[in-house]
Amino acid sequence: MQETIRIKTQGRSMVDITAEVEKFISQSNVETGLCNLFIQHTSASLILCENADSDVRSDLENFMQQMVRDGDPLFRHRAEGPDDMPAHIRSVLTSSSLTIPIAKGRCLLGTWQGIYLWEHRFNAHTRNIIVTIQRD
């Protein structure tokens, strides 16, 4: 079973998509299997992250800003602004896909894990995520 979910972002931020993924798994009626998520973009990514304390996500963003600075004169690719190349680098350093086991019709996430779309651009975008469910 496969579907594309569209997520609207508000610019650079992390969007918790756990509920959308769980809903799709529930509708699939798959009790045991795998859920694969793949984002069709090169300036946003998918991560598993702490979901209870928003400071964790803020700290990750602050760390990434220190590692990959917007508008760095080192970058030649600036076609869409000072956040363009940094967004591509951030995407490469994180992940474009996740695979999560399914048991009893639910994602087998840890107690504090959530599934996040990490938008790396300044402006709002609509992002496509391909969700594929494989039955065991």
Roles of regions detected by a PLM:
Residues 1-136:
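Active-site histidine-anchored catalytic micro-motif
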